Regions:
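Asp-box/BNR beta-propeller blade signature and adjacent active/binding-site loops
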Residues: 1-344
Length: 344
């Protein structure tokens, strides 16, 4: 049976027009737990009502059980944007955003010691006094045990009052308490947005950053996320859209997934297609191996999660589909062999 298959796992409908920002974790018994932002009230904007819904798969993602609610909407507007993290200790963490207003967006975390059967009450990771964007599938645990939650703080999400500032929130007690990094990262125009991080072999942390400057920018931390270098161009063109970076456990190479596109005449710097994967064997200095995941000119693809399950790579991302009434956002699941990324 092939490892390469895909399906729209959470199709959008008129009543549920947006299913986005998901993540997957492999449970100890081999089942897959998928969760995502479920916009349930017939509206699509980022501030529309949403809950965190979930499904389980017993067969590696080929089929999925009934949808259930993992996190009710406790926000003034919604809850959204899922990150799962399996700790070195074995416990499972579930992160999400609580959106209360255009000036109040916080990252929360719940813990499970029984592999997702029960969850603790939410703990706030950010400070409760700002608008913090944390993308799906973003939180990492370093080799030291420290947790790093990359976030961008927005003074005004409508573009006034300065651009976004990227930073990290850090925990040395498995998420029980959190503190902000000592330095932040600033860039022109809309700023340093939607950061993601990966630990490098030399112990530094690489942060990749969404920008309005035509390419992905990067910053480094040599002290476990406490301070960060000034951001610099990464040499990878990109529209105003997020990118995802991680390390393939079986090969040690870095994996980058993003929209390989840039059009300065377009309002968003270009459409969110194609969706491309690239490999780096030199810790992000170059990205010579590239393969196209999606390439439909009338669609968009973004907000990718990456989960490794043995020799398989499990992806989720949203698919933007235009309709006569406007558009919808479906959640897609895709399974690929690790070898696919190497052209095998």
């Amino acid at each position: 049976m092939t490892d390469d298959f895909s399906l729209i796992v959470a199709p959008a409908t008129a009543e549920n027009p947006r299913n986005t920002e998901g993540d997957i974790v492999v449970l100890r018994d081999g089942r897959l737990l998928l969760a995502w932002s479920d916009f349930y009230a017939g509206e699509m904007p980022d501030a529309a009502p949403a809950r965190i819904s979930a499904m389980l798969s017993n067969d590696g993602g080929r089929t999925w059980g009934e949808r259930f609610t993992l996190q009710e909407n406790i926000g003034g507007q919604n809850v959204m944007s899922v990150s799962f993290l399996r700790l070195h200790s074995g416990d499972l963490l579930f992160f999400f955003l609580q959106k209360n207003s255009d000036a109040d967006l916080q990252a929360l975390m719940r813990r499970s010691g029984d592999d997702g059967r029960t969850w603790s009450e939410p703990v706030m990771c950010t400070d409760g006094a700002g608008y913090y964007v944390v993308n799906n599938a973003r939180v990492v645990q370093l080799a030291s045990g420290r947790l790093v939650l990359p976030a961008s703080r927005h003074a005004d999400i409508h573009g006034e009052g300065g651009g976004a500032v990227s930073q990290a929130w850090l925990s040395d007690d498995e998420g029980r308490t959190w503190r902000r990094s000592e330095s932040s990262i600033r860039l022109p125009l809309r700023g340093a947005m939607e950061p993601g991080v990966v630990e490098l072999r030399d112990g530094r942390i690489l942060m990749i950053i969404r920008t309005q400057l035509g390419q992905i920018y990067r910053s480094f931390s040599a002290d476990q996320g406490a301070t960060w270098t000034e951001a610099e161009p990464m040499g990878v063109r990109a529209p105003v859209a997020p990118s995802t970076i991680t390390r393939i456990p079986s090969t040690g190479d870095l994996l980058l997934i993003w929209n390989d596109n840039w059009d300065p005449e377009h309002a968003g710097g270009g459409i969110r297609t194609p969706l491309v994967a690239a490999l780096s064997a030199d810790e992000g200095a170059s990205w010579p191996r590239r393969r196209v995941l999606e390439d439909a000119p009338d669609r968009g693809f973004a907000y990718t999660s990456v989960t490794f399950d043995g020799d398989r790579v499990l992806l989720t991302y949203w698919v933007h589909e235009p309709t006569e009434a406007g558009h919808r956002l479906h959640l897609k699941f895709r399974s690929l062999a690790v070898g696919w990324f190497y052209g095998e």
